[in-house]
């Protein structure tokens, strides 16, 4: 990385940094600079790996087109291998995105009887809870919350409550 910089130049940069930043801030500055350099190296390596992967895919596509133009009968072993790799890559890409429909997988009952929706029939709460367990929750009214003793209700007499008088 420092191909053109010798020891004397690095020593000069260190002394200038010590004079400009001081002994308290110099170690912090060196640590932050090295972390930035590491982050840039990681980013450059990831970009390089992605480009290599894309180039490999492009090479596989070129080999496949070459194989198609020659015909699939007289192929070299390299081309056969690259075709197999391309097929495996295509299968691995398509496999995670396949969604299995549970409705299609399970057979539908042929003689299923659907219950009609009856909104006009009056039932007792016991019958409703047997027919639909969620109906009792929906039909029961919410309990009224009583006012807490620390919070007087509107218009309540607060003379006997010392907390309410403040």
Swiss-Prot record:
Superkingdom field: Bacteria
GO molecular function terms listed in the Swiss-Prot or TrEMBL record: protein transmembrane transporter activity
GO BP, one annotated term: protein transport by the Tat complex
Primary localisation category: membrane
Family: Belongs to the TatB family.
Compartments where located: Cell inner membrane
Regions crossing the membrane: 2-22
Amino acid composition bias (Low complexity), ranges on this chain: 133-153
Oligomeric and partner information: The Tat system comprises two distinct complexes: a TatABC complex, containing multiple copies of TatA, TatB and TatC subunits, and a separate TatA complex, containing only TatA subunits. Substrates initially bind to the TatABC complex, which probably triggers association of the separate TatA complex to form the active translocon.
Presence of keyword rRNA-binding: no
Gene name for this UniProt entry: tatB
Official protein name in the record: Sec-independent protein translocase protein TatB
Disordered: region residues: 69-166
Taxonomic source organism: Shewanella baltica (strain OS155 / ATCC BAA-1091)
Residue spans of biased composition, Polar residues class: 88-97, 112-132, 155-166
One Gene Ontology cellular component annotation held by this UniProt entry: TAT protein transport complex
Role noted for this protein: Part of the twin-arginine translocation (Tat) system that transports large folded proteins containing a characteristic twin-arginine motif in their signal peptide across membranes. Together with TatC, TatB is part of a receptor directly interacting with Tat signal peptides. TatB may form an oligomeric binding site that transiently accommodates folded Tat precursor proteins before their translocation.
PANTHER family: SEC-INDEPENDENT PROTEIN TRANSLOCASE PROTEIN TATA, CHLOROPLASTIC (PTHR33162:SF1)
Cysteines engaged in disulfide bonds, as pairs: none
Membrane topology reported for the UniProt record: Single-pass membrane protein
Keywords per UniProt: Cell inner membrane, Cell membrane, Membrane, Protein transport, Translocation, Transmembrane, Transmembrane helix, Transport
